[in-house]
């Protein structure tokens, strides 16, 4: 192993983590909004059975261990990317595992919004879509950014486990060399690099959340 190998592994880990987080956000953000807006006391109430079904599906997906989930979604992975091994193949199970988690994080952030703010927007004749895009999301933006940072670091941890299916990145190196070949020094280097990546993501996310908090600019 040389510096170039580690550099490429870091890039693969970064690529898979960011891409998976982006797709998880695309699916999880609307779902999280739906969980709040579609509630019986929400701005766009949906049938109780439908909300109950959505919650059950989210809870089931969140409860399945990631390694088992990777195997379960092999058919879906093969249908989308044409293979079940490699860097691209790890994105599919990562997204499936992450988007329910993102939805719950979004739901938690939006539920922290003062109901009076939403009621004020409704009294001024704002539509549900306007309330979501102009009131709920902007007001909860710092919390949402913090939640996405949490999701990003969690997905980073999941991506390391994807080395089991030859997913590439630091996880593959740690498994192939550190575990199977008993090269503890390589395992330690991979762990340190993953910790540094988590710290970097967390620092950037915290700074962004602070900058977006309008209360701190008043």
Q: Where do the language-model regions lie?
A:
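C-terminal transmembrane helix and the adjacent membrane-cytosol boundary/short C-terminal tail
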Residues: 34-41, 187-218
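Short cytoplasmic-facing helical segments at TM-TM junctions of multi-pass membrane proteins
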Residues: 105-144, 174, 214, 218
